[in-house]
Regions:
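Glycine-rich oxoanion-binding loops at beta->alpha junctions
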Residues: 31, 35-66, 213-228
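Short glycine/serine/threonine-rich phosphate/pyrophosphate-binding segments
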Residues: 23-29, 71-78, 100, 195-200
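Single conserved hydrophobic/aromatic residue that forms the stacking wall/gate
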Residues: 1-15, 230-245
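Phosphate/diphosphate-binding loops
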Residues: 63-102, 106-123, 128, 136
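Pre-Walker A segment
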Residues: 9, 13-25, 42
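Active-site phosphate/pyrophosphate-binding segments
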Residues: 9, 13-16, 106-229
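Short, solvent-exposed amphipathic alpha-helical segments in soluble enzyme
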Residues: 30-36, 59-60, 79-83, 106-107, ...
Length: 245
């Protein structure tokens, strides 16, 4: 498949996303955006679960497969199942010559360059940006977003590089905070709304890089059990998004 302006095609009203690990968190983030900006029905799946259960397929569905390498075994297996059921498929990948890109109907490359470290930081940012832009394009095409709002959101995207640079200037502050929790045996990342996927990704990054137990959880569910597992020395990163009551 070749890179394709996906929003220029007549697609259905059901969008399904699949990925593993970081890619799954990208899909979860995109679900919030698509439901808000496009008024489309969106479902997400962990690819390793999707491939091992019986699935119902609707002809108007588009399946989006997110993978940094484009070679994730479970994600490719899920793609193969969808292809065998004649579903429309789209790949969001970093490597456009990959198997997942090759066997998808559409390709949306993230162009992040090689991911050197264990933590897939560049790819995560690239994935959510591509999915956000797709949501904006589809929302505009479906007249769910006014032209002025669309332009403002694009302007905000262009400001991101500068904001990232400012964040990196706080390296010393982050070092000081991390030393406070150096002896912690576990961490809990809490998030609500858009920040819930970020909490999941933050917990995954801590596990991957520090080999410290960490858990991401919806902030509203903290009181239903998880709060009993943590004592005062355990760090809790709380993030919230303003969402309708």
């Amino acid at each position: 498949a070749k890179p394709d302006p996906l929003w220029s095609r007549g697609l259905g009203d059901v969008y399904k996303r699949q990925g593993c690990g970081t890619a799954y968190h990208s899909c979860l983030m995109a679900k919030y955006w698509f439901e808000e900006l496009t008024n489309l029905d969106v479902n997400i799946d962990i690819a390793s679960e999707f491939r091992y259960r019986k699935n119902r397929f609707k002809k108007d569905s588009l399946y989006i497969f997110v993978s940094q390498s484009g070679e994730t075994a479970d994600t490719y297996a899920a793609l193969d199942i969808c292809n065998k059921n004649s579903m429309k498929t789209c790949a969001v990948v970093n490597v456009i010559e990959s198997s997942i890109a090759r066997d998808s109907n559409f390709v949306l490359p993230i162009h992040c360059g090689p991911e050197i470290g264990v933590a897939s930081t560049k790819a995560f940012l690239g994935q959510i940006l591509v999915l956000y832009i797709l949501a904006l394009k589809l929302g505009s095409m479906r007249n769910e977003i006014e032209k002025k709002e669309y332009q403002e959101k694009i302007k905000d995207l262009k400001a991101l590089p500068g904001l990232i640079e400012k964040t990196l200037l706080h390296d010393n502050d982050i070092q000081a905070i991390s030393s406070t929790f150096n002896e912690a045996k576990g961490s809990m990342f809490l998030g609500r709304g858009y920040s819930y996927p970020i909490a999941l990704e933050g917990a995954l990054k801590l596990k991957e890089l520090s080999y410290v137990h960490a858990e991401g959880y919806p902030a509203g569910e903290m009181k239903h059990g998880p709060c009993l597992l943590y004592t005062s020395p355990s760090p809790r990163d709380q993030r919230g998004s303003r969402i309708p009551a």
